[in-house]
Amino acid sequence: MADQLTDDQISEFKEAFSLFDKDGDGCITTKELGTVMRSLGQNPTEAELQDMINEVDADGNGTIDFPEFLNLMARKMKDTDSEEELKEAFRVFDKDQNGFISAAELRHVMTNLGEKLTDEEVDEMIKEADVDGDGQINYEEFVKVMMAK
C-alpha cells in the first residue's frame, strides 16, 4: 500500500510524523493521529480515527510507528481519490437527488454526523464550494472541495 506513495508524499508524511513524535522514539500516540492527519489535509471523523487506530494498533499499546502510519495514509488517500466513493458521498448529501446540495441538505447531513452548525456556518461552507454562485453545490464543485481536503 505505502509503495504507491511518491517520494514527496513519503517525506511530507515523515515530516508531519516527526513533528508529533515528541520523544523521537519512532512512535506517535493514538490521540495524536488525528492531529497529524489534519495537518496533512485529511479530515477524519472520530469514528474513522478509532477504526484506523484499531486496524493499525494490533497490540493495543496506543502507539503507531512510521511504517504503520504510511500504510494508513496510503489507504486513506486511495479512498479519498476513488471516483465511486465521491459519487456515493455526493448522493448521501443530495437527499432529493436533483444533482445539487442545498444548504438544508448540507445542514441535515452535518447534524446527522453530530456537527451542529449555525446557519452562518452552513452558508459559509456553501459559499466556499459554490464556484458558479447559484447558492448550491453541484457535483463538480463537490469533487473540487473533496480533492482539496
UniProtKB/Swiss-Prot annotation:
GO terms for molecular function: calcium ion binding. The gene is CAM2. Ca(2+) 2 binds at D57, D59, N61, T63, E68. PANTHER family: CALMODULIN, MYOSIN LIGHT CHAIN 1, 3. Pfam families: EF-hand_7. It is found in: Cytoplasm, Cytoskeleton; Cytoplasm. GO terms for cellular component: cytoplasm; microtubule. This is Calmodulin-2. Ca(2+) 1 binds at D21, D23, D25, C27, E32. Residues 8-43, 44-79, 81-116, 117-149 form the EF-hand domain. Transmembrane segments: none annotated. Belongs to the calmodulin family. Ca(2+) 4 binds at D130, D132, D134, Q136, E141. This protein has four functional calcium-binding sites. Its main location: cytoplasm. SUPFAM superfamilies: EF-hand. The lineage of its organism: Eukaryota, Viridiplantae, Streptophyta, Embryophyta, Tracheophyta. Calmodulin mediates the control of a large number of enzymes, ion channels and other proteins by Ca(2+). Among the enzymes to be stimulated by the calmodulin-Ca(2+) complex are a number of protein kinases and phosphatases. InterPro entries: CALM/Myosin/TropC-like (IPR050230), EF-hand-dom_pair (IPR011992), EF_Hand_1_Ca_BS (IPR018247), EF_hand_dom (IPR002048). Interacts with KCBP and CIP111. Binds to IQD1 and IQD20.
